[in-house]
Amino acid sequence: MQPFTTHTGLAVIIDSANIDTDQIIPKQFLSKVTRDGFGVHLFHDWRYLDDAGDQPNPEFSLNRPRYQGASILLAKENFGCGSSREHAPWALADFGLRVIIAPSFADIFYGNAINNGLLPVRLTEAEVVQLMREVEAEEGAQVSVDLQAQTVTSPSGASFSFEIAPSARHNLLNGLDAIGISLGYGEAIAAYETEIPGWRA
């Protein structure tokens, strides 16, 4: 998993609350078990005018030319609600997003995002609204996120602080997913196994 320390990128806005995981990645695209290839289906029902995904919806923010290449998503409260599908952060990350900023997240989505190297940032509703206004006002506006300092810097230079659990912060800074964390205990596991008595018939 790629370590996350600081990130500055183009921000895109989805000005909606209660965006659930079925909207993030609809159920018909969940047959794959690898993490790759989900980005094309991200927000499928909003991004496309047809079921096949051949006709992009020009009104949807992710399809607007000014937001192409965005790596930070701004949304409203309760982002990632609904089912616990891990495919949701897979799709967001595969699309190229590194940070989701919202006033609140569904708990399971929040944990899944961190476990997959995606940083969910909780700011107040007023701070998110300010970010949205600044991003909408200036084409190409970028937002900076510093996980070390736990700050978000708006296009105008305003700085907002956010909280994150120390363990989650440590894992993201060091690029540790569940497998990486387990490997860190390799020596301790090996030492324990040498102390286990052999099987006796």
From Swiss-Prot:
Coiled-coil boundaries: none
Catalysed reaction, written as an equation: (2R,3S)-3-isopropylmalate = (2S)-2-isopropylmalate
EC supergroup of this enzyme: lyase
GO biological process, one term: L-leucine biosynthetic process
GO cellular component, one term: 3-isopropylmalate dehydratase complex
E.C. numbers: 4.2.1.33
Pfam families: Aconitase_C (PF00694)
Record-linked InterPro entries: 3-IsopropMal_deHydase_ssu, Aconitase/3IPM_dehydase_swvl, AconitaseA/IPMdHydase_ssu_swvl, IPMI_Swivel, LeuD
The protein's annotated pathway: Amino-acid biosynthesis; L-leucine biosynthesis; L-leucine from 3-methyl-2-oxobutanoate: step 2/4
Subunit comment: Heterodimer of LeuC and LeuD.
Protein's job: Catalyzes the isomerization between 2-isopropylmalate and 3-isopropylmalate, via the formation of 2-isopropylmaleate.
HAMAP family: LeuD_type1
PANTHER family reported in the protein's UniProt record: 3-ISOPROPYLMALATE DEHYDRATASE SMALL SUBUNIT, 3-ISOPROPYLMALATE DEHYDRATASE SMALL SUBUNIT 2-RELATED-RELATED
Protein name, UniProt field: 3-isopropylmalate dehydratase small subunit
Classification of source organism: Bacteria, Pseudomonadati, Pseudomonadota, Gammaproteobacteria, Alteromonadales
